Regions:
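Charge-rich, well-structured scaffold segments of protease-associated domains
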Residues: 42, 100-252, 319-455
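Gram-negative bacterial Sec-dependent N-terminal signal peptides
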Residues: 1-21
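A generic structural motif
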Residues: 68-72, 128-129, 285-289, 344-350
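M16/MPP (pitrilysin/insulinase) zinc-metallopeptidase core fold and M16-derived inactive scaffolds
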Residues: 62-126, 191-195, 306-322
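Short, solvent-exposed loop/turn elements at domain surfaces
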Residues: 49-52, 58-61, 70-74, 289-290, ...
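Cleaved targeting-peptide boundary
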Residues: 23-31
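His/Glu-based metal-binding/catalytic segments typifying zinc-dependent metallopeptidases
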Residues: 252-311, 419
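Mature N-terminal segment immediately following signal peptide/propeptide cleavage
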Residues: 31-63
């Protein structure tokens, strides 16, 4: 996943040459950020199969990216089911019970895990490459033949409620939920991946709906099988056809509501005195695109203005010591999301002053060109960070999964990074003026006051 300033998703510009196989597509440019060939194979049922050979003798990482997340939960009363299936997918099938699945998986040397975001659910494992066929058998079986009783469903629903209760005892989780609800009035980004609490409480009564959700979304056209490591595209494609070829395409498409334009600053406050005072500024940002300069320019801006090397950080955290931490960045999302600035305070009374300093920093970046040397250094540092993080099959697969969730195409990583080198001082001023407006701002605060300090 993308961090605040994309520190884990930037990379060094490396040269890669690609050869094409008759059954796959590759792009054959020499200016790609990822130094390994990406082979794609589209099956007749709509399943996308991606192979990235990597020098990791005896190891392979298998990821399945299901492009279904909280974003797709458009029906009232049943939020949280994308995350719920992250749990249910380990319940077993007629062929492999939960215990048999775990035992078979253990024989591959792999451990399976999963996670959910607003835009996708991802399942992943890394094991012995000579056991890849068994991994395919296990994964195809549960994706095509998942089976669970109503009792098992209710048991897992109770576990999800417990997870929510534990997570949202944290004030930061509470303000995240409140900020989402406040910033988005119509779009499904208004609820977290956990879902609304009332829906989670009612989840045990939604057994029939759970089967409908699985039938709608656990279909080949929503999924990408990604394999990275000591493999060949010929072998991976053959296994995909063998084990996923019978998977039937579905017909359901969710219609995600469009968020109307925000026209005034919104405020939300959480009264809590158990943590240091906190506030955030969330501006409406763009949807992810691998063809627009906006997101790369915002990422570079975030590093220059809000990172730990920025002038603002040095002043507020190091010199004046009135702020514990400050960071900021845009979220990668399929639909327009948020650029959020997070501030942890030393004293709540200094919130108005710190807000004013942030506004001054934004005003400067709107009006003045950033230093040319700083701009080039920032772009290089961001790209170098990526290069340091793609040294295992799992880390490469995780990076590619991020872009598959956004566009369905792993080559987006290469197209995006071609844009990073093109970011100019004028682009940074442009996005600052375009997105950092009071009408598109949501301010969230935490303090022991009944009312927020900043409203």
């Amino acid at each position: 996943m993308k961090t605040i300033i994309k520190a884990t998703v930037m990379g060094l510009m490396l040269i890669a040459s690609h050869s094409a196989l008759s059954a796959e597509t590759t792009e054959t440019s020499t200016d790609k950020i990822l130094p390994y060939p990406i082979y794609q194979h589209k099956m007749d049922n709509g399943l996308n199969v991606v192979t990235v050979p990597f020098d990791s003798p005896g190891l392979a990482s298998l990821h399945i990216i299901t492009r279904v997340g909280a974003r797709n939960e458009v029906e009232p009363g049943v939020t949280g089911f994308a995350h719920f299936f992250e749990h249910m997918m380990f319940r077993g099938t007629d062929k492999y019970s939960k215990e048999e699945y775990s035992a078979a998986l253990k024989s591959t040397g792999a451990a399976a895990n999963a996670n959910t975001t607003q835009d996708r659910t991802a399942y992943h494992m890394t094991g012995n490459s000579d056991k890849l066929e068994l991994m395919f058998e296990l994964e195809s079986d549960r994706f095509m033949n998942l089976k669970y009783s109503e009792h098992e469903f209710k048991t897992e629903a109770g576990a999800v409620k417990g997870e929510y209760t534990k997570n949202f005892a944290n004030p930061y989780s509470q303000i995240y939920e409140k900020r989402s609800e406040t910033a988005f009035n119509t779009h499904t980004y208004s609820h977290t991946t956990m879902g609304y609490f009332d829906d989670i409480v009612d989840m045990p009564n939604q057994y029939e709906y759970s089967k409908l959700f699985f039938d709608r979304y656990y279909r080949p056209e929503y999924n990408t099988v990604l394999v990275v490591g000591d493999v060949t595209p010929e072998k991976v494609n053959a296994l995909a056809e063998k084990y996923f070829g019978a998977w039937q395409r579905g017909s359901y498409e969710s219609v995600v509501p469009v968020e109307p334009e925000q026209t005034e600053t919104r405020y939300v406050h959480l009264q809590d005195g158990t943590i240091p005072a906190y506030f955030s500024m969330s501006f409406k940002g763009p949807a992810f695109s691998d063809s627009s300069i906006d997101m790369p320019a915002l990422d570079v801006l975030a590093s220059i203005v809000f990172s730990s090397t920025s002038d603002l950080y040095k002043k507020l955290v190091i010199e004046e010591q009135i702020v514990r931490s400050i960071s900021g960045g845009a979220s990668d999302s399929r639909d327009p999301g948020l650029f959020t600035i997070h501030v942890s305070m030393v004293e709540k009374e200094d919130m108005p002053y710190v807000l004013g300093e942030i506004e001054k920093a934004i005003a400067r970046v709107k009006a003045e060109d950033v230093n040319a040397a700083l701009l080039e250094r920032t772009k290089s540092n961001l790209k170098y960070s990526f290069a340091m993080g793609i040294d295992t099959p799992g880390s490469i697969a995780q990076s590619l999964s991020h872009y598959i969730q956004l566009t369905g195409d792993p080559e987006s990583i290469n197209r995006l990074y071609a844009l990073y080198d093109k970011v100019s001082a004028a682009d940074i001023k442009m996005v600052a003026n375009k997105y950092f407006t009071a009408d598109h701002l949501t301010i969230a605060t935490i303090s022991d006051d009944e009312l927020g300090v900043l409203k």
